[in-house]
Amino acid sequence: MTEISTGKPASNFSAPSPDGKTISLKESLGKVTIIDFWASWCGPCRSENPNVVAMYNELHDKGLNIIGVSLDKDAAKWKEAIAKDKLTWAHVSNLKFWDEPIAKQYNVQSIPATFILDAKGNIVAKDLRGDALKAKVKELLGVK
């Protein structure tokens, strides 16, 4: 297993999107990319979503990409949460709950969990939320 830590390259992965297409991390990279581990049943994840949506709407055109990795097991609930919370970025899930291979690959023990990547795909920070997350993303994008 590759070590997943700050300063290291993020490990590539691919998984099905809600519409059944396979999406990979490599094709989702922007100037800054957030890998966001969450689930429809995770209260703290859903509470954080409005902050992430606002940040994405403000900074996507400046180079921010997000790929959501869900630990859901029910496809309908996953898709419903994406629509209800207006999560317009790329999403993937193998619908395997805590057996989600990408969560295991990234050694995710609890959610929400975030990994912030630079333009080269290196992990520069982990598990930031709210203002701290936005500040780090803006710093990486060179946005005031």
What residue ranges belong to the model's regions?
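Alpha/beta-hydrolase fold active-site loops
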Residues: 32-33, 112
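Non-catalytic, surface beta->alpha helical segment in thiol-disulfide oxidoreductase systems
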Residues: 110-113, 119-144
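Active-site acidic short loop of glycosyltransferases
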Residues: 29-31, 61, 87, 108
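Long, His/Glu/Asp-enriched segments that create or flank divalent metal/ion-associated functional microenvironments
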Residues: 38-41, 48, 71, 76, ...
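Conserved redox-active cysteine motifs that mediate thiol-disulfide chemistry
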Residues: 30, 37-54
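Hydrophobic beta-strand anchors of alpha/beta hydrolase catalytic cores
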Residues: 34-35, 66
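Short, internal strand/loop/helix patches
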Residues: 67, 79-115, 119-120
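N-terminal "domain-start" segment that seeds a small globular fold
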Residues: 1-25, 142-143
